[in-house]
Amino acid sequence: MHTLTHDTRWDGRWIWDHTDGTEKNAYVLFRRAFELREVPASSVLRITATTRYRLYLNGVLLGEGPPKSQPFLTYYDEYLIEGPAATAGPRLVRGDNVIAVIVQHVGYDDDSRGGLLAELRPLADATRGRPVSDTAPPVAPDTGPGPGAPIVATDGLWKVTRSAAWRADTFFCHFNRVVPYQEHFDARRLDPRWLEARYDDSTWSDAAIVHGRHSDRPPRVAPWTRLVPRDIPFMEERSTYAQTVAETGEVTAATNRTRSGDLSISLSQPARAVELATIDGPEALLTADGETALACSTAHRSDPKIGIREPVLMLDFGRIVNAYVELDVEGPAGATLEIGYAERLHDGHFNNAIEGQFADAITIREGRQRWRVFAWKAFRYLRVRVHSAFSPLIVHELVAVETRYPFEEHGAFRASQTKLNEVFEMCRYTLRLASNEYITDTPWREQGQWLGDVAAVTLGGIYACFGETRLARKFLRQSAATQYPTGFLGNMTNTYSANWQNVHVDFALWWLMALRDYYRYTGEEEIVHELYPTAVGLVEAVLAYRDDDGLVTDMPYVVFIDWAAVDTTGASAAFNAILAGALKAMGELARVRGDGWMTDRAEGARRRIADSFAAVFWQQDEGLFCDAVDDPDGVDSGGGRVPTGRYSEQTNAAAIVFG
């Protein structure tokens, strides 16, 4: 069974601090200490949050999540926690225990507010006959006692504090809706003992329960009105080190008066050869062993005209990776490491201020510490700059912890030409980069699950290279959930925008064909039945704009054709060709559904387009289909529709493919 079941069985309550939860880029810490006299053989911890959580059990990182969700389709995660017999990993113990959670509320999505929901139960109580995860075997209903009280669940007994260690007013990369904020973390402002069971949290507040209209019991609490289990595996992680130190140098400290909160400005400053700053042992950054010493110059203390020189270095990982940067460092309190990310160099130089201003920074506390950025980034080049380190800052390790969808490579391609094999491997690796807890158009810039990009391009590659269907199924379902009252779907479907007017209508048609292709590939009828109403609503929304020739014309929404220079004025040939393909797909889905009326309606509409297409769009003198025809003077002018004068490869290719 692959239908995504809406879960109404929660004893936990949504909690937050004592604000309205709408603050952007807010980091909130939660703790719940508890004592166990007996430890269950196994337990399950269910958890979700808006927007992203990092979960610890007894000081050990348990996991991160949930998959990026819309408020009306919120994923939750489940963690199996082994009992006292476990020899490794996070586990419960007899006596004092603590669950600690960091939640970042990004706040970019419409109708978003911060919240945390969690509960810990003995395994038999938690599952109640349901799988622990999409990949786990079902747990029999009779493996334990009936449902009882949870061990702990989010409620007013949890402790909460708004963390001052993370700056909220950091630079905002407007084109990224998933991780738009640079992270500025000051380790001096967070006591690392907060993860310990016996930490004194008496100065923290009691958590505030978020109330719904009629109840505070999920799912009766808006905006989280539908809670569903993660339907894809957890991501796999592996440690990767840079291949080369591509640059070492120093820069003169200067005040950023352009965008003072934007780290990418200082990280893009050109460097000179090292003269006064200290960079000792940079090659140690290429392994897990060794030490690299970084320090700012001190010559300015005797000669102020010199200025402060700060060390910079750039690491090349040899390929683009999706990774969390993790540092093991020690040095003087107040020293700051800035980290900039880039996919490519510009004229041989690092400059991420002009494309994607992705950067993070840590200000360290005294002594040795380990830090991991909160959000992964896509990069090949990493540039590090150090401020305020007038005694050596020691980097024991700088590692990129790659996050990857756990694909298995079931697909293969072999050719006698080496170049073709190389191209295939490049494509397969690109698909790996584009696949995480959602499918992105680019993991570097937007991290957006663009409806048309994924449906038209990416899914077929995932099937061919990996034979994987769970991620595709999640995309189809999550995209369907964005359907507006107009019948059209959202453009970016791992986020939510209430702007119903800004839709790409052709993208939605590709989604419809992707649903048909998924059925062809898997033979799974369940998702066809589940998403069929969405498909019908979409088709009816488009057909409402047909003219007397059966062609869609004067579409008020965007017909995008993915950046191509195609004229879509009036009646668009490319769009109507794509619509013909989508109507064929709709007919196939209707037959699976047993809906004879829609089968006939879709086939009839497709036939009308086919009958009119050549007569309206074919230009004999050019030997081509024109991009569009329009009545420039209006419907009642009497002049009729005329070609708009543009011809494109995209239009004529669409006519061939869908004709």
Can you say where each PLM-predicted feature lies in the sequence?
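N-terminal leader/propeptide and maturation segments of large enzyme subunits in energy/redox metabolism
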Residues: M586-M598, A602
